[in-house]
Amino acid sequence: MVKIFIDPGHGGSDPGATGNGLQEKTLTLQIALALRTILTNEYEGVSLLLSRTSDQYVSLNDRTNAANNWGADFFLSIHVNSGGGTGFESYIYPDVGAPTTTYQSTIHSEVIQAVDFADRGKKTANFHVLRESAMPALLTENGFIDTVSDANKLKTSSFIQSLARGHANGLEQAFNLKKTSSSGLYKVQIGAFKVKANADSLASNAEAKGFDSIVLLKDGLYKVQIGAFSSKDNADTLAARAKNAGFDAIVILES
């Protein structure tokens, strides 16, 4: 059993960075909760604990103490940047060596593959959560809240889902996580494109009509997915609703 501690940065009276009508504390929680859902629904042999699951203040000491007392195998702190830049970067504590450096490289690479963010590189910093955690720790900075282009991406649920998916893919690779040994998931797909911009456009259209969407890169195509279910009946119901809304929806069983 791999024990992963997920830390959505800031919260409560501490909003974190702000800009373009967004607050960092809200975005970090959205990414963390989406990541928890993916890991819980799609993987086995993984145990999760979050530093917070709502808009509450948690001190830095309480965050690392919770992870240390729980005996986590990995500490993942999720943040959003500010300062006028653009793109994604990740941090580990200086001079920690393997396996932390390996985990950083793997997760960083998977996030970059999953989202349309510039790669600002793998970095080190003397952050509290990296220094005081008793296990390998990584802090990710997911775009710049005060840069309009980054903020516009962070405002869409499909982009938040893609960020969560990138983190999940990285954790799968880093810790050799196994997919749940079920009969698979029935996924509702409304499009597949060679050009990511076309997939993003369809995803935005779906969101405007009330569907949660995510863009996934698989087999060389950017696929727009609006749901995944263990029950085919639930998938069929969503597909029918999507068709009524004008989308060319199909249900795909993936093991």
From Swiss-Prot:
Cofactor: Zn(2+)
Subcellular location(s) of the protein: Secreted, Cell wall
CC annotations in GO: extracellular region; outer membrane-bounded periplasmic space
Effect annotated for changing residue 79 to L: Loss of activity
Outcome recorded upon mutating residue 55 to V: Loss of activity
An example Gene Ontology molecular-function term: N-acetylmuramoyl-L-alanine amidase activity
Binding site for Zn(2+): 10, 24, 79
Placement of Sequence repeats on the sequence: 184-219, 220-255
Keywords: Cell wall, Cell wall biogenesis/degradation, Competence, Hydrolase, Metal-binding, Repeat, Secreted, Sporulation, Zinc
Means of activity regulation: Inhibited by EDTA.
Enzyme Commission no: 3.5.1.28
pH dependence: Optimum pH is 8.5-9.5.
Induction: Induced at 6 to 7 hours after sporulation.
Domain notes: Contains an N-terminal catalytic domain and two C-terminal tandem repeat sequences that play an important role in peptidoglycan binding.
Protein name, as recorded: Sporulation-specific N-acetylmuramoyl-L-alanine amidase
Gene: cwlC
